[in-house]
């Protein structure tokens, strides 16, 4: 391997922890870790450390949890670590220009899309919902813009018809660390080549909201099915019946015309609950009523058949 680099790692969720884990077993030295402050989580709202913090503490690496990197005293924490490079993966805080300039080789970011497509907070989900045929990981040199920096490495990954955000997340979490190590090798031996992004092709992946997860029957069955896969595992698509939300975990498209109003239940049996969409039919196969476990359409029909009488409308 090339010369060992002194690395600051900045990240928060499991996706980031998987990258840190690979760095810890590489020949590089992780001199410090920045992660979001502990947050309330679980039923008891107990303060819970991020997956990145847990991993760093297991390896006795100094952990820093500032609420912002704008104050000079917090920027001084970064400077004092005297790093060659800062690796940022789903950190959740903005890095101001002084921080970007502190490491000798700057700051690099692992982003879950093929930039300039899907800059922003939810690239995996937005690529799925849009019906893209592929996604991937881009490693870029960070600048002050939102995912606008020059690209150092790209790895593509096909999006399969059955992929959900959960399965794509796992695929990219496996691809990203490999690309990160290759990029660090090139930075260490000065062979890295940075390619500017073409802003004309940029798209933006806005953060997901629970409101968006409500199924809109005025969309086509294909769009609804993609929405269900994109919002799995969070926030999970849903509809309202009998004034209660019912989450939808799995569905399929039936490419068949119908003369019914969108949202109308056409059929309900062990094969699924067929609902009219603006174009085509959505056959719902796995559901979850409020406070219950995920179940098959047949199991829900056994207890709540009155919810799904053909001719009734879902909201």
Swiss-Prot record:
Alphabetical list of InterPro entries matching this protein: Fmt, Formyl_trans_C, Formyl_trans_C_sf, Formyl_transf_N, Formyl_transf_N_sf, Formyl_transferase-like_C_sf, GART_AS, Met-tRNA-FMT_C
Keywords: Protein biosynthesis, Transferase
A Pfam family per the record: Formyl_trans_C
Binding site for (6S)-5,6,7,8-tetrahydrofolate: 113-116
GO CC term (a single one): cytosol
GO molecular function terms noted in the UniProt entry: methionyl-tRNA formyltransferase activity
Assigned protein family: Belongs to the Fmt family.
Reported function: Attaches a formyl group to the free amino group of methionyl-tRNA(fMet). The formyl group appears to play a dual role in the initiator identity of N-formylmethionyl-tRNA by promoting its recognition by IF2 and preventing the misappropriation of this tRNA by the elongation apparatus.
HAMAP family assigned to the protein according to its UniProt record, in alphabetical order: Formyl_trans
Protein name: Methionyl-tRNA formyltransferase
Top-level taxonomy: Bacteria, Pseudomonadati, Pseudomonadota, Gammaproteobacteria, Enterobacterales
